[in-house]
Amino acid sequence: MCNQMFIIRYSEIGLKGEKSRRQMENILIQNIKSELERYNIFPEFKKSDGRIYIFTDSKLLYDILPRIFGIKSFSHAEEFKFRTIEEIVSITVSKFSGMISGKKFAVSAKRSGSHSFTSMDIEKILGDALYKYSAGVDLEHPDIRIYIEIRDNRFYLFTEKIEGPGGLPLKSEGKLLSLFSGGIDSPVATYMVMKRGSATDLLFCSLAHPVDTVQMLMAAKNLLDKYSIGYNAKIFIIDGSKLVTAISEHPDQMYTNIIFKKLLYEYAEYLCEKYGYNGMVTGESIGQVSSQTPQNLMLISEGIKYPVYRPLIGFDKEETINYSKSKSLFMNQSSAEFCSLFSKNPGIIVNHKDFYNEIKKFNVKDYMQELVEIDKNTIDDYIKSIKNKRFRGELDNVEFIDLRSGSDYENWHEPGAINLNLGELRNFIEHADRFKNYVFYCKKGLNSAYAASIMSKHGFNAYYVSERDLKSMQKN
């Protein structure tokens, strides 16, 4: 009689002292249990000599275990009891004689406990017993590699080792707050600190609610459902639209991108203090955009009391994209960065004194206010509650507002559209007709989404669309 089960292996946990290792093993087991319980799977768990054994035959574990941090590899195995080496040989031959017919094989053995034989003895004895059923032995590139692990009076047979994500168990290394945009960089940065065992919550500053909020939540759901196993991560959503309005009306546009980032850091600092986070995480890398030069990163971080962790600091964009794809984090959705709402010619080298003279004009609590706090388990419900204002081409009594540059407007615009910049939006709203449907469009859709969200807050029927999507509607 045998038991169907899974063998879990770890690497770094085994390097810890006895107390830390025991704690991390227990956290890892609890994380696995919490995910299995979602599917009504309640198996028995055992620990022994650097292994965790899960007694279940559920194929769901093939999907779940590769996403749980702390697991180096795992195998679906069968457990047998034995008294003599002859019993091991008999059971192994009965299991694999048919499987290796016409194929080359190899045997890899490991042993723990007090026995009259060594691991090499087992490999030789089993190899000799199986040889006549096979096409021969190939130790380097066998068609089938038979693994046997012997622990005291039990042994385990399996034919594959499946890689896990490695790292440390989630919740074993403190708690961090990720500045999360939902683009390419922030999910990867968040994944990397989660892999190191840090339970990580997300902070998102919405500039065009609900549009950019929905896009962010889709990226957050993809990340958290896959990898935040054992931890129900929080998501803080704050409204930064007042800041966009203030900055778009500001006479000096050189510092606007950096002002935004500095204020976001200050709000994150406030949450770190309020909820006991050990630091904040960003997806910044040196020189990627104007606000991420070493000089500007220093300015943004200056005076912040909590550590700022930047896992991608040395990555280029292609490396980040490739990493994102390898972890199934890459989402092929069109989303512009916040900087497209601000300066077209941002400052690359910023004067320290001038910057602080500018930042004094902006109080973070005046311009960033919390919209909502949700968690991983309520993302779907919150998305359903948000009314999406994307224009789909089926409206009467429509007025189009072009938010692109004057030169782009002259080259092409929707017939009858008026050309406007965000700094003129407040005045436009004061004189708008409440019986019309207003459709804003811009290059990528974020400026227009922001304008539509502001106008909707004033009680108007306002929608947004990107230039590309609007042109596509015309062709159809």
Q: Language model features by range: what are they?
A:
Residues M1-L177, P187-N232, Y382-S385, C442-K444:
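RNA-binding accessory domains that recognize and position tRNA/RNA substrates
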Residues N40-E44, Y277-Q292, S301-G303, I313-E358:
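Mid-to-C-terminal catalytic subdomains of enzymes
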Residues S94-G98, A246, F391-E394, L425-R434:
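Short amphipathic alpha-helix with an adjacent loop that forms part of the alpha/beta core around
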Residues K110-S112, F362-N411:
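Flexible, polar/low-complexity N-terminal or interdomain linker segments that lie immediately upstream
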Residues I125-L130, K161, G166-E173, Y227, ...:
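Active-site adenylate/phosphate-handling loop in enzymes that bind or generate adenylated species
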Residues I184-D185, N447:
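Hydrophobic/small residue at the entry helix of a nucleotide-binding pocket
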Residues K221-H250, E337:
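A conserved beta-strand->alpha-helix junction
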Residues G406-N437, K444-N476:
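Rhodanese-like catalytic fold shared by cysteine-dependent sulfurtransferases
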